[in-house]
Amino acid sequence: MTDGLRRIAMVSMHTSPADLPGRGDAGGMNVSILALASALAARGVEVDLLTRADREPVDRELAEGVSLRTLAAGPPTPIPKGRLVDVADEFGEAVATLVGRRAPRYDLLHAHYWLSGLATLPVAIELGLPFVQSFHTLAAMKNRALGEGDTPEPEGRLRGEGFLVTQADAIVAGSSAEVTTLIDDLRASPDRLWVIPPGVDTELFSPRRARNDTAVREHLGLELDRPLLVMAGRIQPLKDQELAVRILAQVHASRGWAPLLVIAGEASDDSYRDRLERIATDLGVESDVRFVGALDRETLADLFAVAELTLMTSHSETFGLVALESAASGTPVIGFRGTGLVDSISDGESGVLVATRDAFDWAAVVVSLLGDAPRLARLGASARGYAEGFTWATAAASLLAVYENLVRS
């Protein structure tokens, strides 16, 4: 147990850290929270993960030293993320009740995402507890890079994030792109800003899983003899799976055949998936696109390991944890340079960063790599080495230093 720090609460109001990434509002943030909590617990700090109950509240232990606590706020049903601000005060009151006003059970509160901060900051102020804020995504970043069909983030979120930046005892960012936005757009004070990149589970995501190639392909209904391009994440305009379909069509046009594009994740809006299917049909590659849904972590790790390349076509990424997971699996990543992927993809080492959003430019990279097996193998090996430099133990140690500094002061 560390000096002065026994138990902390991480708050994720809008999505449970235990939810499956790629489904609903779950993504890299969920993975990061749970992994950090487990790594902190391994260092002797008990961690409670607090989330809103979207069904009957049930508390459970997720790992040794890590417990999930679901708190009632609003009806016990899913509420669209855009309307959760209406129950933020009620959720905050539930947090205060759990923490205990007379003798707080936690040494520190760490809010993840702006809604959690909005609900939790008043509790921290009332009880005199140190307050840490992680945003994971920022409205200003998203609004600068909207995809076709995307809805701009509301003014209320912009104001809320700006307010939290002025009030938090510490702000933890995951990438240089996030830091730039925090300082330039939200006027964050650099002396309260910490940059802690996420880690990756290199035991789970490993090239060793490639030996399961046939079983993985059969399980997912994929042909045994075709190269695979993978996209993993929620199916939504922000992630721009449409660009991936257009890249596939461009590869087909230049080579006369196409690899399989495997899209792992669920649609935030069915109309967008319908649009993707129409575009694939119009471009003549409908038989080359597979939607496999949101995958559990083991199956996703298998898919990355047997794939040739991973595509990350998002308009906006704060960091892009998927890039590390793919790299750890020995699979290079092609990503858009104009995002936080500049921190998660090492150009020429773990993948290739593309400067444009032109499908022709992306397809040229895909064709070049698929047509040069030795180069692809070298890039896969160096990608694994790059990913090994990002560990959850290191991230947790850095985060613990932030916590201990606040508790001591």
Where are these regions (language model features)?
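Glycosyltransferase donor-sugar binding loop
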Residues: 260-278
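Conserved acidic donor-binding segment of nucleotide-sugar-dependent glycosyltransferases
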Residues: 347-348, 352-359, 368-373
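Nucleotide-activated donor-binding/catalytic signature segment of Leloir-type glycosyltransferases, i.e.
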Residues: 273-295
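Aromatic "clamp/platform" in nucleotide-sugar-dependent glycosyltransferases that forms part
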Residues: 315
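N-terminal subdomain of nucleotide-sugar transferases
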Residues: 1-66, 70
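Carbohydrate-associated surface elements
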Residues: 177, 199
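Short alpha-helical donor nucleotide-sugar binding micro-motif in glycosyltransferases
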Residues: 294, 302-307
